[in-house]
Amino acid sequence: MKLYLAAFLGAVATPGAFAHQIHGILLVNGTETPEWKYVRDVAWEGAYEPEKYPNTEFFKTPPQTDINNPNITCGRNAFDSASKTETADILAGSEVGFRVSWDGNGKYGVFWHPGPGQIYLSRAPNDDLEDYRGDGDWFKIATGAAVSNTEWLLWNKHDFNFTIPKTTPPGKYLMRIEQFMPSTVEYSQWYVNCAHVNIIGPGGGTPTGFARFPGTYTVDDPGIKVPLNQIVNSGELPQDQLRLLEYKPPGPALWTG
């Protein structure tokens, strides 16, 4: 445990660490849309240093570490870009996704941290996305967890693809991606972004199981703070002792329509 804790805290404390990412690209039926066209842009972390990092996107990649901070909703100061974010028309029942637009190594990066991803929807009051901070109710429509006892679905992948439930009530929503690395300590890194989407379809479903961000998660929730056998890169357990398939993600149950 001491070995894992030291490695974990050392990695997260390293300035300019490469293991960060942002998801500024929305995928619609497998088609890439322009970066930050439909996803709320986020602010830099700290001071921009053009002599060291000429691309400003690098400074958008650091995670949220306080799950009680309003930035956990859609990313760092994301509401500031709401008025210039366009809204994508999405057919209920179709496949959509988020693509990692930048990581520590450059454009079109990957999900660096071994851990799950989840997708939530929140209907904008009066279908007004420009004035909606995301402080209402969210329901979960997708989880990308483990595919085996030793491998996470998203780790080192470029995209997180999922399907909008067929009976989702039509209207304008914030669509939120979260990806994070569970740990054995009460500390986690969160990579969150939100897209503007207009869901078109027959409706008929009634979403259930709501969450709020911030508000629903705590640092010691199961799924955020986990046992050592659900940590891929601890260095303390052999592969055959890992049990990722026993992992239960935080938040409400999936709503599938």
From Swiss-Prot:
Enzyme class: oxidoreductase
Residues holding O2: 189
GO BP field: cellulose catabolic process
Keywords, alphabetical: Carbohydrate metabolism, Cellulose degradation, Copper, Disulfide bond, Glycoprotein, Metal-binding, Monooxygenase, Oxidoreductase, Polysaccharide degradation, Secreted, Signal
Gene Ontology terms for molecular function: metal ion binding; monooxygenase activity
Cofactor(s) listed: Cu(2+)
Transmembrane segments annotated in the record for this chain: none
UniProt KW Signal keyword: yes
Disulfide bridges in this chain: 74-194
Signal peptide: 1-19
Biotech / industrial applications: Lignocellulose is the most abundant polymeric composite on Earth and is a recalcitrant but promising renewable substrate for industrial biotechnology applications. Together with cellobiose dehydrogenases (CDHs) an enzymatic system capable of oxidative cellulose cleavage is formed, which increases the efficiency of cellulases and put LPMOs at focus of biofuel research.
Gene3D superfamilies xrefs: 2.70.50.70
InterPro entries: AA9, AA9_LPMO
Binding site for Cu(2+): 20, 113, 191
Compartment(s) of residence: Secreted
Positions annotated with a glycan in the UniProt record: 29, 71, 161
Cofactor binding note: Binds 1 copper ion per subunit.
An annotated GO cellular component: extracellular region
Functional summary from the UniProt entry: Lytic polysaccharide monooxygenase (LPMO) that depolymerizes crystalline and amorphous polysaccharides via the oxidation of scissile alpha- or beta-(1-4)-glycosidic bonds, yielding C1 and C4 oxidation products. Catalysis by LPMOs requires the reduction of the active-site copper from Cu(II) to Cu(I) by a reducing agent and H(2)O(2) or O(2) as a cosubstrate. Shows no activity on wheat arabinoxylan, konjac glucomannan, acetylated spruce galactoglucomannan, or cellopentaose.
PANTHER family linked to this entry: ENDO-BETA-1,4-GLUCANASE D, PUTATIVE (AFU_ORTHOLOGUE AFUA_1G12560)-RELATED
Name of this protein: AA9 family lytic polysaccharide monooxygenase U
